[in-house]
Swiss-Prot record:
The keyword Transmembrane helix applies. Pfam families: PQ-loop. This is Solute carrier family 66 member 2. SMART domains: CTNS (SM00679).
């Protein structure tokens, strides 16, 4: 009787841990962006944050959702993608509003201009929505046509996680161009690192598709590189680039 009771407790604890891990996986990905969002809102300055981070996460999570139709993976990962897309759109909305408000004579730039020089630097949030919808429509249609091809499905999954693995690269490049990490939330990067480490372990333990595990580890390496930038640029400060060059970086 005691043994049965003990087994029930162990089973309950395992279920609790599994439920907690799933919740952490679903919502943990958006937590790092909370301090960055608050910093931008408080300072009304978005120059230190690369909006290309949002672009890469939107692409990665849209592709991951499409990958799910060809290769079902755990539901928490699917919900994580949906919540991350909403979060990135909110980040883009704030960054766009702040950037336009800080420009003296903002020239209207829109998605329908199809000007590559100003890609992802449009003046209205609706243009970002149009771009995301266009990308989703095109990739969704291609996926619908090739969903029966195992090779296409695996490539789609790889592109999804590989794009997410390069998430920190735009921020890494922006910091390098500015020779500074000013304006970037260090809390965000620390949360990236801890979250990506947890995520990589989650992928391995739950036997997620191999693409997830490999690219999760790559993400951790990029996070560590950004943290090294924080140390180097604070310990050995260099002459900052001009505002014009900074704005040009990304």
């Amino acid at each position: 009787m005691e043994r049965e009771g003990l087994e029930w407790i162990v089973a309950f604890l395992r279920m609790l841990v599994s439920w907690g891990a799933s919740c952490a996986m679903i919502f943990g990905g958006v937590v790092p962006y909370i301090p960055q969002y608050r910093d931008i809102r408080r300072t009304q300055n978005a120059e230190g944050f690369s909006i290309y981070v949002c672009l890469m996460l939107l692409i990665a999570n849209i592709l991951r959702i499409l990958f799910w139709f060809g290769h079902h993976f755990e539901s928490p990962l699917l919900w994580q993608s949906i919540i991350m897309i909403v979060t990135m759109l909110l980040m883009l909305k704030l960054c766009t509003e702040v950037r336009v408000a800080n420009e003296l004579n903002p020239k209207r730039r829109s998605f329908t201009d199809f000007d590559t020089a100003f890609f992802w630097h449009w003046t209205r949030f609706i243009d970002f929505i149009q771009c995301v919808l266009a990308f989703t429509g095109v990739t969704g249609y291609i996926t619908y046509l090739l969903l029966d091809s195992p090779l296409f499905v695996e490539i789609l999954g790889f592109l999804a996680v590989f794009t997410e693995a390069l998430l920190g690269v735009p921020q890494l490049y922006r910091n390098h161009q500015n020779y500074s990490t000013e304006g970037m939330s260090i809390k965000m990067v620390l949360m990236w690192t801890s979250g990506d480490t947890f995520k990589s372990a989650y992928f391995v333990l739950n036997q997620a598709p191999f693409q997830f595990s490999i690219c999760g580890l790559l993400q951790v390496f990029v996070d560590i590189a950004i943290l090294l930038q924080v140390y180097l640029y604070s310990a050995y400060p260099q002459k900052p680039v001009s505002h014009a060059t900074s704005a040009k970086a990304l």
